[in-house]
């Protein structure tokens, strides 16, 4: 589970501790994504849904958000919490796109949230210029920064019980989304090339007396036309 998502889960679990909220965790991915949901169970989540279907394969952020929004339409909820972004694509698009698909208000880059009664929340949003305190009504979608909190550790008992709980696997037939909006067919983004950044060679290590070291540094700086 990536750091932003884990902070988002912790924020949801804090609502559970304080107000008795029911926490449902959703992920979309291949079979091994089941491990992430088991981790969420071990931390304290109540329900886990794994979106997995060949029709979801090849999805970009738009198709991914369409699938998750389709699953959310089948559920009752007051608040949707996502991490700010994944650690692979780093687009920070899925959370806001989910909100758009569902027609819900959204607040991104959260570092704090407070329940004000009724259907009102006060949230602390990070910006490059500082922080904003905003009021938002539920249902809504928020995206969370990893710096928002310190996620709880999984207990031994929680880990053991996590493997006794059922992860629900949902496919295309379980969500209310047109097939043309899912997977590769529903993805306007196309990857033409991917590559691995080349590793840098290791630097040289010199063991010299201080005076010799100083002379060598000056020599190298002159070679680079720095001095």
Where are the regions a protein language model picked out?
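N-terminal glycine-rich FAD/FM-binding segment characteristic of electron-transfer flavoproteins
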Residues: 1-227
